[in-house]
Amino acid sequence: MQFEKEVEILASREKVWNFIWDVDRFIACVPGCKEAKTIEAGKLYSATMVEKVGPFRVEFPTTIEVLERDELTRIRAQASGADNKIGSRMKLSLDVNLRQDGEKTVLGFIAGIDILGKLAALGHGIIKRKAEQVLDEFAHAVKQRLEGES
């Protein structure tokens, strides 16, 4: 499944870029992210994602690897994790783009998500709705956080 989202933020591209790399502030905007750790700054991170999807409560210990980083412009990353309790795996590819538009920064996401195992048995529709909800909540939280800072 692939998802695309753009959000306009009344902040400079530099401010948005710095926010993305401030792991503690950034993860506070990620719905269901219970904890995150920097393993190698700018390259490798770990996080635990907890969500309710249909009848399942999933907990994915996740590894996030930054594959490309173009300063102030683009980040390409991949993540993967598994919930062994319910026998499900998740893979994510993520492309994040920033572009200045006057006083605003347009923050764009393209995410590809693959779900395997019991969670996949819920069907495309349920998983798609949940993924869209999480992405919308995340975009809203980032916008509120950055626009609320002076």
Predicted regions and their residues:
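A conserved amphipathic terminal alpha-helix motif
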Residues: 68, 116-150
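Beta-strand/loop substructures that line and gate deep hydrophobic ligand-binding cavities in soluble
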Residues: 78-129
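Glycine-rich portal/gate segments that line the openings of hydrophobic small-molecule binding cavities
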Residues: 37-82, 137
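Short strand-connecting beta-turns/loops that link adjacent beta-strands
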Residues: 12, 41-42, 71-72, 101-104
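Hydrophobic/aromatic beta-strand elements that line small-molecule binding cavities or substrate pockets
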Residues: 5-7, 33, 61-68, 92-100
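Hydrophobic ligand-binding cavity/cleft-lining segments
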Residues: 1-46, 52, 148-150
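Intrinsic-disorder/low-complexity, polar/charged segments enriched in Ser/Thr/Lys/Arg/Asp/Glu/Gln
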Residues: 2-6, 44, 59-61, 74, ...
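Hydrophobic pocket/interface hotspot
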Residues: 16, 26, 66, 109, ...
